[in-house]
UniProtKB/Swiss-Prot annotation:
Disruption phenotype: Reduced seed germination potential and inhibition of seedling establishment by sucrose. Exhibits abnormal shoot and leaf development. Increased tolerance of seedlings to submergence and starvation. GO terms for biological process: defense response to bacterium; defense response to fungus; protein ubiquitination; regulation of lipid catabolic process; regulation of seed germination; response to abscisic acid; ubiquitin-dependent protein catabolic process; ubiquitin-dependent protein catabolic process via the N-end rule pathway. PANTHER family: E3 UBIQUITIN-PROTEIN LIGASE PRT6, UBIQUITIN LIGASE E3 ALPHA-RELATED. One of its GO terms (molecular function) is ubiquitin protein ligase activity. Residues 1167-1186, 1338-1380 are annotated as: Disordered. It holds the Pfam family UBR1-like_wing. A zinc finger (UBR-type) spans 119-189. This is E3 ubiquitin-protein ligase PRT6.
């Protein structure tokens, strides 16, 4: 074949033929060319294995043919075999050779041998899988195990947490990652892996070796072709395709092996290792293989590294490959290249965190040196000409640098590695210091003084993130540096210390300052001068006590850090200029300096260290082994620098000229040999922060600070006593610093080390003052981040400690003068009262605050760990109450991990348990407020102000005068700080501030406003505290002067001499200021936390007097009232002033009371005069008028929009109508979490088919529109004829007609008179029956059966003959009786609520119109993110709650007919009864009599029809919305226009359902899951606006249901059908054969639904619903008749009783024959069910069969009685103001109030039943069960129901439910159980994995949120419509929070799961165990169950429409 032939130019032969051809070419006979034949051939010819494997694998030519087929496949009819199929066939043949049998069978047999015997789990994770961390079992923080391993292990008592994975594998069974005690029962460690059997190993091994050899060769060919370039593109494509396909199939086979046998996997891993070069090329393969192939290869690696041997070899190859990737990325200069190599990110955490492996790699593979070299390469590429990191370059390699630094942290986190880098190979730590020079001073800022710039530094955060990572490495490095030495070394150091204690004489000690021992110089390779005497150094070592505690590595690192820092300091502009001046001289002495340390010549900066030559990098210098670093640090290595017995190499570090701008000369290596930090005199360096560059990034300073503070803590802190060695306090403290900093002079060290740190503090002060405003946000952000909690512990606090160290060593006055100079306040001491610039007061206050912090801060130099914890917690809790995690997060990193944390926290705080929506929080104990530190370094101005206000509120005094800074115990080396507080310079600053305050008073332009004055006085108080402690001290410290300057100068009149004013002293200034401020109290400082400056100054003067006798004498003359007054005089003067204040207060109080009395008298007189006006009406008329309009006055409202109190227009109440499925949820019961999560397209909440829609569309034929119009006219005529007939008959019988007195129309008045007449007729019949003692009604069964043939009440309806044409077109089958007849679409009912505010409908229309116009113009308006204007939603203009309609007020309608009183005989009968009896006869008589009156009137048609009555226009809005809820919109628009919905029937059904929902909402408390059985809880609901709006609705229905003749007739016919059903057990079929088709709409359809409902068997429906429809159909006066209402309650209570008995029997169908109830109602029902069935219709999910049946009956009647009680109370209620005083959903729930109403107990339910039975005069249960009338009626009801049931008309089951509260889904107590069950589940609709699963708490289905949907059907909005009628309550599984959905509206809600500290864990960040908080879950349940989602301001405040929640 020609090599230059085209890739796709050949005709492809069969792949099988090619294999046969190759087998023949290697000598395989024809008879062996099958799978089994090849096995036999291999057995006979083992030497042919290599050739045979090569022949079986596809060749390059096969790949070429495959590529050709792939190109031509779209043009062919048949699909050719793919390349993967060919390779799989080859692998199958190879597996035959390996196992010498069928591969699948062999692998299954191997799996059986290894069943439950796996050593390592190795399960590979994907993104966001669940895993567990266990801090008890893990070997490092990166280890984790999978869920099955965690469940199979015992971790209950361990410290574990849940995490979301980003990849990796399970560590269970891996001894290098997981402790053996934590292994699960299925994995026992890699040593438990059984070796492969010898026979199998002998057969598998050679085949694998040959295969791996071929694999290796193919990969090498692909790599070389890619690097060198192939001869043609075709060749490159073939090689790459071959390597990809072969790798994919081989890895696939090996992964299959790993799933079958761990022994086989281990065997494979050893073979890969033994295959020369394979592992190395596999790691490099990501450079030329496809990503999907590499993904599978990485999965294989994760499986294989479970074997320790393979992990070690893999780690070696990984370390070798690491710098190759970094070099390539740096070469390309972008992170995009790094993303192409995912191996590093995937496996660095797997390798570098292993405690046993990483140290091996560091020592054997120079891992640490390699990482430092990689980081050096990155820093060099990202640095600019000045040698500093640049933001733009660093951003391009951000991810790469983070990876390398992260790996450095992994490596350094091993204690042995950090010790290795600082003790054994110090050149590594030296290299790290050199790398820090790139970050030292990075991102400098310079103040803009010209045109403001709008500079947005998008990369600023990169420097802070880098600084944070560096700080973490510093912490690890310092820990390794100070790691404990051996016991022998400690013992030797103790002996050295004892010898040193015997020595005395300062001269001898000071002569050895800075000298090191010979051994130390060898170890550290430090050469300080050419005259160094090694024997002298050895002597120093013997007498130096600090070497007993401080390891030589720490001293070395401190000095090396100083030398590198010295190099960087030479590049500073200010220091460079200073060095230029000093270049000609050797320095001068500073008189103020008391330190007589030996002066040194200023030498070159030299550093030593043998640099490892193994820093593997292609860009490294071969002579040094180091990568070239930045230009300013260079390494000059030569043999001349080798010195000492060990030949340590010396490296000269010089500063590059690029970093020095002064004459382009290298100033640190000048002719004079200047040594910057060795300056003996205090340097006079000038620097202006406002005009020169400044950087907040000083990693070298921070490392130095860490090293020194750690050394101090070891020598003087808590850890000093642990080693048994303590430093004698007799040793001068200077010895510590001389031992640590060596031969660097204190003056040079202090002045130059503090320089940049001080500049940062000045920069922050200037930013606060507003000097950097023109720089945009860059300066402000840098300042805020520097001072923030997250960064301050890594910068600000360490910088402050450095300032303290420098202050302890520096001359005090020079130090303070430098502070003045850097703050730009040198002119502040001039005493010129004219302010120089606007920023000066802030700068002065910040400088004084810094001085106080330097003096009093003890974080690193005096406080123990417990004391620091206490201080930090108090600091945080002073600003507010916080959760546990917030407190821990606010602590410094080292303190947050302390074991003493919880103990200290409990000691200083009070824990508040979680309640309501509040999390568990800690608050500060009252006794701890006195420990508040106003000068904590991390105070932010806002937090400090809050703390001062809270202090003032809790303690009643000002924090400024009580929480004064104090001088506390400090480590002895830092006692020199005290000189700063008492020096002359500090005295001058304080005096100047007092002088300016006195000269300017309280002027705004004062150079010392109150803020400065208060801070100066606090500094003075601190200085006096220092003086007090010094005077009280028995012995003076050697570093402190015997005289105290501030006391000596306080009385000298030296202030104001130069200004020509009167001379003043500090004391005289204080006295004058005290007298000037004598009158300022709290009234002069209105803000909280103010203080009385005068009294404060008085206290300071007393301190002066107490400390110093000279000051006391001066003060006796200047202020004798302060110093010379006796105690008795003070008390007397104080008591006198108190009496004066009390007298003045009484006078003011009397004046106010007199004024109020006068105004009250004036008002009463006006009111009396108006009441005395003459009234022209008679007394009787006035009384009637008052009675009639009393209710109207009570509910009179003012429009919330126009606020016109004089408007006469009627107002309407704002209401909110919403669909509800609450009743269905209660009937069904809550789902359980342990059910399988499901996601369904349609969910039936009660488990039965949704028949509501079936009822709306029956089998009836549609009626054409013309016929419907004709029908409507006929119906109007018939209705009017019927009404007039009844009216004529009743009036003819002698009834009088009562006229309406409120001005209503004649027709309406006639219909009201008609209903009153009907009511009186029926009542007379009932009275007659009672008088005749009719206790029974003849209800024989045969009468019921034949009653349909009678022309009586139960006779055929008179409507049967109305429409013969239509009847012939209709089917005779009625709709199912399963529904309640009149139902909204897709829900149980409509719930009505109201906020209680009212508007004029005209005002509302204008308001809505304006909202629509603004929405059309896309103008933002309030509530735009909440309301849907298309649904006519809006927010109440007052309370901002949701509304969508209005309900007009209807005063007096309910009471327009006076309540009819019972006859005296009826009262007497009821009163004389011995016990209550069942009023069944009265109820039956009522129904029968009403039906008779209606039937009689229906026969007469003598009156001309009057037409359709008027409809109320003010009900148009609510009626239209209810109509849209109840019925779909008709297709024929004319029908909708002609036939408006009945206003009364839909509102009555809404009233009914709202009452039912209200009753359900009162079954549970707001914060408890226990049921509440209390009648008071029912009535409390009616007192809210919810109950009051129902009263308004009831009056509206009463006023509207008599206004339309069709509607009146509809009610009357419905009443007749209801009476037929109850009294005779007959269902009228006439209406169903006429109306009810799908095409009918309007009133005709409603008539059909109501009549069908009335005709249904009474047992087929809820008894309360039947009661409500009965009251609706009866003449309206019955609603106010107490006796009629009671009788109806009795009969429907009996219906409820019968339904319960049937449900009880339905729960025991097999035991019906065995039940023996006796001769009573129970036995009758049981027999009827056994004979005719029908019990399947009745079901109950809560039936307790163990309870007595009589108690069960009573309990199940409770829902009916409770709803009747609500209705009863509603009918008796009077109109009142509608507003709610507060939002019941937003108030914190009080557990005592909720549970005090009624405590649940088994007997409480029966007690509640007894209370309600007494209210309604219901007799005992035994009387009811034996009532003969009820027994006969029950037979009728049962026969009626069974007849309908047999014809299959009753389909939908009826759920009989007791008083059970509404409950959301029953959730597990432990959240991890729910998380494990719901995560990574597939959607039922689309089968996709739901990335962010959402659990519906209403039905238990798994859904997806709107921001991460898997499909439309499973989305939360669609599911909420299907499941909850638009309402959805979802638990976001990953986030742990709640999502509340209301159609398109959604809002977040707090999590119901809290941890042990009562705190939420959003997104499982902490991953700790979360427990279900019942109180929170109960509050959510109450919110949902009471329909409060759209009425809670908390919910609405977070509501959005369609937005993504984060």
């Amino acid at each position: 074949m020609e090599t230059n032939s085209s890739l796709f130019g050949l005709v492809s032969p069969s792949s099988h033929d090619l294999v046969i051809e190759r087998l023949a070419s290697v000598g395989v006979p024809k008879k062996y060319r099958s799978k089994r034949g090849l096995v036999e051939f291999v057995r006979a010819n083992p030497a042919k294995i290599s050739e045979l494997v090569s022949a079986l694998l596809p060749t390059d030519d096969d790949v070429k043919l495959g590529l050709k087929e792939a190109r031509e496949r779209p043009r062919k009819s048949a699909v050719s075999p793919t390349m993967k199929k060919r390779f799989r066939e080859s692998m199958n043949m190879l597996q035959w050779l390996m196992f010498q049998d069928e591969p699948d069978v062999s692998l299954r047999n191997l799996a059986k041998l290894n069943l439950d015997q796996r050593g390592v789990c190795g399960s590979v994770w994907g993104q966001n899988d669940i895993a567990y961390r266990c801090r008890t079992c893990e070997n490092d923080p990166t280890c984790a195990i999978c869920v099955p391993c965690f469940q199979n292990g015992d971790h209950n008592s361990h410290d574990y947490s849940i995490i979301y994975t980003g990849g990796g594998c399970c560590d269970c069974g891996d001894e290098t990652a997981w402790k053996p005690d934590g292994f699960c029962s299925n994995h026992k460690g890699s040593e438990q892996i059984r070796p492969l059997s010898e026979n199998l190993a002998n057969s598998v091994g050679p085949i694998l070796d040959a295969l791996f050899t071929c694999w290796n060769n193919k990969l090498l060919s692909a790599e070389s072709s890619g690097q060198k370039g192939a001869r043609s593109n075709d060749t490159l494509v073939i090689l790459q395709k071959m390597s990809n396909e072969l790798t994919f199939i081989v890895v696939e086979m090996l992964l299959e092996f790993s799933m079958s046998s761990e022994s086989l996997l281990s065997f494979v891993s050893r073979r890969i290792i033994s295959s020369s070069g394979l592992l190395s090329i596999l790691l490099k393969a990501e450079r030329f293989l496809d990503q999907d192939v590499m993904k599978k290869l990485h999965d294989l690696f994760l499986k294989l590294i479970g074997d320790p041997v393979f992990k070690c070899e893999f780690a070696k190859a990984f370390v070798s490959y690491y710098p190759v990737v970094i070099s390539e990325v740096v070469k390309q200069g972008t992170d995009n290249a790094f993303k192409k190599y995912p191996l590093l990110s995937t496996f660095s955490v797997q390798i570098l965190t292993v405690p046993t492996l990483t140290p091996f790699l560091v020592k054997e593979m120079n891992l640490l040196a390699m990482l430092l070299g990689c980081l050096s390469d990155i820093f060099v590429s990202c640095s600019g000409e000045d040698g500093l990191l640049q933001a733009t370059k660093l951003e391009r390699l951000c991810e790469t640098s983070e990876r390398v630094i992260g790996d450095l942290k992994f490596v350094m986190s091993h204690a042995i590695v950090s010790k290795y880098a600082t003790h054994e190979h110090r050149e590594l730590s030296r290299s790290w210091l050199t790398l820090l020079t790139f970050a030292q001073g990075m991102n400098p800022l310079k103040r803009e003084t010209g045109i403001p710039i709008d500079e947005e530094n998008d990369y600023m955060h990169l420097f802070f993130v880098l600084g944070h990572s560096i700080a973490v490495i510093h912490s690890l490095l310092v820990n390794g540096t100070y790691s404990a030495a051996s016991d022998e070394e400690i013992e030797n150091d103790r002996n050295a210390k004892e010898e040193f204690d015997k020595c005395d004489g300062d001269g001898e000690r000071y002569a050895k300052v800075g000298r090191l021992s010979h051994e130390d110089s060898v170890c550290t390779a430090i050469v300080s001068s050419s005259s160094f005497d090694s024997s002298m150094a050895s002597e120093v070592h013997k007498i130096d006590p600090f070497h007993a505690l401080l390891p030589s590595s720490a001293i070395y690192l401190i000095r090396e850090c100083l030398k590198v820092l010295e190099t960087c300091l030479g590049n500073d502009e200010g220091i460079s200029k200073f060095l230029c001046k000093l270049s000609s001289s050797s320095g001068r002495n500073i008189p103020e300096s008391k330190m007589s340390w030996p002066r040194r010549d200023l030498l070159n900066v030299e550093t030593g260290g043998s640099v490892s030559s193994n820093l593997a990098s292609s860009s490294r210098d071969p002579s040094t082994g180091l990568s070239p670093l930045c230009g300013d640090i260079q390494t000059n290595l030569s043999l001349d620098n080798v010195c000492g017995p060990y030949g340590v190499v010396q490296t000269d570090v010089t500063a590059d000229s690029k970093r020095v701008s002064c004459n382009s000369a290298d100033l640190t290596k000048n002719a004079s040999g200047l040594r910057i930090l060795g300056l003996c005199d205090w340097p006079d360096i000038h620097y202006d922060v406002s005009s020169q560059a400044i950087s907040v990034h000083l990693p070298l300073h921070r490392l130095l600070s860490l090293l020194i503070q750690k050394a101090l803590r070891i020598c003087y802190g808590e850890s000093a006593s642990y080693n048994g060695v303590s430093i004698s306090h007799e040793i001068p403290h200077a010895d510590f610093f001389s031992s640590v900093i060596g031969d660097f002079h204190p003056c040079g060290f202090s002045a130059l080390v503090m320089e940049h740190v001080l500049q940062i503090r000045v920069f922050c002060a200037q930013v606060i003052a507003g000097m950097w405003k023109k720089n945009g946000d860059s300066a402000l952000v840098s300042c805020e981040w520097y001072r923030s909690v997250r960064w301050s512990e890594q910068g600000l606090e360490l910088d402050l400690f450095l300032l303290q160290c420098c202050a302890a060593l520096a001359p005090a006055d020079s130090y303070v003068d430098k502070l003045l100079s850097r703050f730009g306040l040198s002119s502040y001491l001039s005493l010129n009262p004219d302010i120089t610039n606007e920023y000066e007061p802030v700068l002065v206050q910040e400088m004084l605050g810094l001085l106080i912090q330097i003096l009093q801060e003890r974080r690193f130099c005096g406080l123990s760990t417990a004391e620091s914890l206490r201080r930090e917690i108090i600091f945080k809790l002073a600003t507010g109450d916080f959760t546990h995690s917030q407190l821990v997060k606010s602590l410094p990193r080292d303190l947050s991990k302390s074991d003493e944390l919880q103990e200290v926290l409990d000691d200083v705080s009070v824990y508040c348990n979680p309640s309501g929506m509040n999390q568990g929080k800690y608050s500060l104990q009252s006794s701890c407020w006195k420990e508040l530190d106003l000068y904590h370094p991390r105070w932010q101005s806002r937090d400090l102000q809050s703390a001062e206000e809270r202090f003032s509120r809790y303690c009643g005094v000002s924090a400024l005068t009580t929480q004064l800074p104090r001088w506390r115990m400090i480590y002895p080396p830092l006692k020199g700080l005290a000189r700063i507080g008492t020096c002359k310079a500090t005295f001058q600053i304080i005096s100047s501030a007092l002088y300016y305050a006195l000269q300017s008073g309280t002027s705004v332009k004062s150079r010392a406003p109150d803020g400065v004055l208060i801070t100066a006085l606090q500094l003075l108080s601190l200085s006096l505290d220092i003086c007090t402690q010094q005077r009280q001290s028995n012995s003076q410290d050697c570093c402190l002067e015997n005289s105290i300057p501030i006391l000596e100068l306080a009385g000298l009149e030296i202030i104001g001499i130069a200004q020509g004013t009167e001379k003043e002293s500090l004391l005289s200034l204080l006295v004058s200021l005290m007298k000037t401020r004598m009158g300022d109290g709290r009234h002069q400082f209105p803000e909280p936390g103010s203080c009385n400056i005068s009294s404060w100054i008085g206290n300071l003067l007393k301190k002066f007097s107490a400390i110093d006798s000279v000051c006391m004498n001066l003060l006796q003359s200047l202020a004798p009232e302060v110093v010379g007054q006796s105690g008795f005089d003070k008390v007397m003067s104080g008591s006198t002033s108190d009496e004066k204040r009390k007298a003045k207060a009484k006078e003011r109080q009397a004046a106010i009371m007199a004024k109020m009395k006068a105004e009250q008298s004036k008002f009463l007189s006006t009111l009396s005069s108006s009441m005395d006006d003459d009234d022209p009406r008679s007394e009787f008329e006035t009384s009637d008028s008052v009675m009639e309009h009393d209710s109207e006055i009570a509910v009179r409202e003012v429009c919330s929009l126009c606020h016109d109190p004089d408007s006469k227009d009627p107002v309407s109440f704002l209401i909110f109508l919403q669909k509800s499925k609450l009743l269905s949820f209660v009937d069904r019961g809550p789902p359980s979490w342990d059910q399988c999560p499901q996601s369904e397209k349609k969910i039936s909440v009660d488990g039965a088919p949704d028949l509501l829609r079936m009822n709306a569309s029956s089998d009836s034929l549609r009626i054409s529109s013309p016929l419907m119009l004709q029908l409507s006219d006929d119906t109007i005529s018939e209705s009017a004829n019927m009404i007039e007939s009844i009216k004529a008959r009743l009036i003819g019988n002698g009834q009088t007609e009562k006229r309406s007195s409120d001005g209503r129309g004649k027709d309406e008045s006639n219909m009201e008179s008609l209903e009153i007449a009907m009511y009186q007729t029926v009542r007379n019949k009932i009275e007659n029956m009672i008088n005749q003692s009719l206790t029974r009604v003849d209800h024989q069964p045969h009468e019921a059966e034949n009653c349909s043939e009678k022309n009586s009440v139960g006779g055929p309806s008179t409507l049967q003959g109305r429409f013969p044409d239509i009847r012939s077109r209709q089917t005779s089958r009625r709709p199912d009786a399963g529904s309640d007849g009149f139902h909204p679409i897709d829900c149980d009912g409509v719930y009505l609520s109201s906020c209680g505010h009212a508007v004029h409908q005209s005002c509302l229309e204008r308001y809505l119109k304006s909202l629509k116009e603004r929405s059309g113009r896309r103008t933002v308006f309030e509530g735009a993110h909440i309301v849907d204007l298309k649904k006519k939603e809006f927010l109440c203009p007052v309370c901002r709650r949701l509304a969508n309609s209005v309900l007009p007020e209807c005063p007096g309608d309910l009471c327009s007919v006076s309540k009819l009183q019972d006859s005296p005989r009826t009262k007497l009968r009821r009163k004389d009864a011995l016990q209550p009896s069942l009023w069944l006869s009265e109820a039956l008589c009522l129904l029968r009599s009403a039906a008779e009156v209606i039937e009689d009137g229906d026969r007469g048609k003598t009156v001309t029809p009057q037409g359709d009555g008027p409809r109320r226009k003010d009900l148009k809005s609510v009626s239209k919305m209810l109509w849209d809820f109840y019925f779909p919109k008709p297709e024929d628009k004319t029908l909708k226009r002609l036939w408006l919905p009945p206003q009364s029937i839909v509102m009555w059904d809404t009233l009914k359902y709202s009452l039912i929902s209200m009753e359900i909402g009162t079954r549970f408390a707001k914060n408890s899951m226990l049921p509440v059985y209390c009648i008071d809880s029912l009535y409390e609901e009616l007192k809210t606006s919810k109950g009051t709006i129902l009263s308004v609705l009831l009056r509206v229905v009463q006023s509207s249901r008599t206004k339309n003749t069709i509607h009146v007739r509809q009610r009357f016919v419905g009443m007749k059908h209801l009476a037929e059903s109850i009294c005779y057990g007959v269902s009228s079929s006439s209406s169903s054969s006429i109306f009810g088709s799908e095409g009918t709409t309007g009133s005709l359809k409603n008539i059909d639904l109501l009549w069908n409902r009335a005709s249904d068997p009474v047992l087929a429906h809820d008894p309360f619903s039947s009661l409500m429809w009965a009251l609706f159909c009866l003449p309206f006066p019955f609603l106010t008749c107490e006796e009629s209402l009671l009788s109806l309650v009795h009969i429907f209570h009996s219906v409820s009783l019968v339904q319960t008995v049937i449900a009880y029997c339905a729960c025991r169908p097999s035991e019906l024959s065995e039940l023996n109830f006796g001769e009573n109602l129970l036995n009758d029902i049981s027999n009827a069910l056994r004979e005719s069935g029908g019990w399947e219709y009745f079901r109950s999910n809560n039936m307790d069969l163990s309870c007595d049946i009589k108690d069960t009956i009573r309990k199940y009647s409770l829902p009916f009685l409770r709803r009747c009680a609500l209705l009863w109370k509603l009918l008796k209620s009077t109109p009142r103001k509608l507003h709610e005083e507060s939002d019941m959903f937003d108030l914190p729930s009080d557990p005592t109030t909720d549970n005090m109403d009624f405590i649940y107990s088994p007997q409480s339910e029966l007690n509640h039943v007894q209370e309600l039975e007494k209210m309604f005069n219901i007799p005992p249960i035994d009387i009811i069960l034996n009532d003969e009338l009820l027994r006969s009626s029950t037979q009728i009801w049962l026969q009626h129901f069974q007849r309908e049931y047999r014809v299959n008309r009753v389909k939908r089951s009826l759920c009989i439910t007791p008083v059970v509260p509404f409950q959301l889904m029953k959730l597990p107590n432990l959240y991890q159980d729910l998380l494990q069950r719901c995560i990574k589940k597939r959607c039922v609709n689309c089968t996709k994995v739901i990335e962010e699963p959402v659990l519906c708490l209403l039905c238990g289905s798994l859904c997806s949120p709107i921001w991460s949907p898997c499909c439309r059907e499973s989305g939360c909005p669609n599911h909420a419509i299907t499941c909850g009628a638009g309402t959805g309550v979802f638990l976001l599984i990953r986030r742990t929070t709640i999502l509340l959905q209301r159609f398109a509206r959604q809002s977040p809600w707090p999590s119901p799961y809290l941890d042990t500290f009562g705190e939420e864990d959003i997104d499982m960040i902490r991953g700790k165990r979360l427990y279900l908080n019942e109180e929170r879950y109960a509050a959510l349940t109450y919110l949902v169950g009471s329909h409060g989602l759209d009425r809670s301001s908390k919910v609405l405040g977070q509501t959005t429409i369609g937005a993504v929640l984060h």
